[in-house]
């Protein structure tokens, strides 16, 4: 039984990088549409932010749109993953507080379920990094070789 468990653990450990890649791709896809929509009509986003009580709505419209768009590309390529994850978490926390909290948990009712899942995935990327299938890994490998 222990041998079977060890085989299972070995396989699980080898699947870490593909799993981290999948998390990054899902998050990049998830942030793409909101980022694109914000940039398509940033003034409407600022007006909406103002209507829901977000401080400095124009500035925060640009900040959230920029963070999400940067997040899409950085997550896609696995570059600066641990760094971009933190501002994306902040964007999700603000979204939960200002938009989703009042609807409760279920995603089907515009609740905070999906933003919470994003936060959990982003925390995993902060904890484990972007994996072997990333520019972060290539840069780290290159730095090791050059020293």
Can you annotate each of these PLM segments?
Residues 1-40, 58-66, 70-147:
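Extended, low-polarity transmembrane helix blocks
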């Amino acid at each position: 039984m222990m041998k079977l468990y060890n085989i299972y653990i070995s396989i699980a450990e080898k699947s870490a990088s593909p799993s981290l890649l999948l998390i990054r791709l899902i998050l990049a896809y998830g942030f793409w549409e909101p980022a694109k929509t914000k940039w398509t009509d940033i003034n409407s986003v600022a007006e909406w932010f103002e209507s829901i009580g977000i401080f400095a709505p124009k500035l925060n419209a640009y900040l959230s749109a920029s963070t999400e768009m940067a997040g899409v590309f950085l997550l896609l390529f696995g570059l600066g993953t641990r760094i971009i994850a933190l501002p994306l978490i902040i964007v999700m926390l603000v979204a939960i507080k200002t938009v989703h909290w009042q609807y409760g948990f279920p995603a089907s009712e515009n609740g905070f379920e999906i933003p919470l899942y994003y936060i959990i995935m982003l925390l995993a990327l902060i904890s484990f990094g972007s994996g072997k299938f990333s520019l972060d890994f290539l840069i780290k490998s290159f730095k090791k070789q050059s020293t």
